[in-house]
Amino acid sequence: MGALPAGFRGARYALGNATLMPGLIDVHTHLTWYFNAQDRFHTNSDGETPGQGAIAASANAYATLMSGITTTQSLGSPEDRDLRDAINRGALPGPRLLTSLGSLSEASGTPDELRAKVRAFKARGADVIKLFASKSIRDGGGQTMTDAQLQAACDEGHTLGLRVLVHAHAAEAMKAAVNAGCDQIEHGIFATDEVLQLMVQKGTYLSPQCGLVFRNYLDNRAKYQGIGNYNDVGFKSMEESMPLGIATVRKVTHTKGLKVVFGTDAVAGAHGRNVEDLICRINEAGQPPLEALHGATTLAAQSLRLADSLGTLAPRMLADLVAVPGDVTRDATALRRVFFVMKGGR
């Protein structure tokens, strides 16, 4: 939104009684996750072709953009790279995309082997590194990576100029990741006051989920059931975790000084409904609307190291704009009714 050249004739938009906001930023999605032709969660062994996967990912990206998400971080699969590059060169409509291209875990090797794999991700074009330091919530969420593994991976990422994000549910996994200097914790459902204060001291970002991801899994249970740990035990765990997730978001968003950003973990079935998690933060977890929106714009841009171009409406910033009817600070559900999206001035 810098100075216009002399003689420039631009369009005028009459948005009426609307809230105009910076484009929303979702720091945790999975754009390549989709339901296949059999209406089941896609896996690499279901017979779907790469072309089918590309079409599905493109549709997910478009749905995400039209919901008001103009930038997202897909964490992550190798297919994200082609999707990112196609969007960035204007071949496909979609949100500005960053990706980890995959993830590393306790099974990825010794500290030295982890360093080598971080370098390999960088060489392949990863924008960020993702680590799994704990089990899935469907398996209890306990710590898996050792302190030495976390230290090596986070240190190598920083040496290469990459941010390092860590999937961690258990407080001990969160603490280990924070002490290792990692940049952001994903989920954090079992966060304690002690680890949250440590995050405040270290300036670590937190991306918790309020309800969309669990509700989406439960609503689409038949499409996931029987694949990997999407079993009866796993679904029971997710059902039991729903109120805990909301309580955790309530606790973390009321922890003074904690950098809480907007990340939905949107998977197959949730793309285009990302704002439901933001509405949950406001209406169910009690986060003040402006603080919730700050976490989905300015603060999220800072977490991506893109605050010099995204996240605020100001001169010389990229023109990412979203409009919803009425006053979103009085009615958070207005976020469901996005009627205007501009990304990069288009």
Regions found by a protein language model. Give the residues of each.
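Histidine-rich, glycine-flanked metal-binding segment
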Residues: 1-21
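Divalent metal-coordination and catalytic microenvironments
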Residues: 17, 25-28, 68, 97, ...
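Metal-associated gating/positioning segment near the N- to mid-region
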Residues: 18-89, 148, 172, 177-180
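Active-site mouth loops of central-metabolism enzymes
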Residues: 41-55, 100-116, 142, 163
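Short, acidic/polar
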Residues: 53-61, 109-122, 168-173
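Divalent metal-dependent hydrolysis catalytic cores, especially in the metallo-beta-lactamase
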Residues: 54-80, 94-104, 124-136, 163, ...
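Active-site core of metal-dependent hydrolases
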Residues: 107, 132, 138-243, 261, ...
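His/Asp/Glu-enriched, well-ordered alpha-helical/loop segment
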Residues: 159, 230-233, 241-328
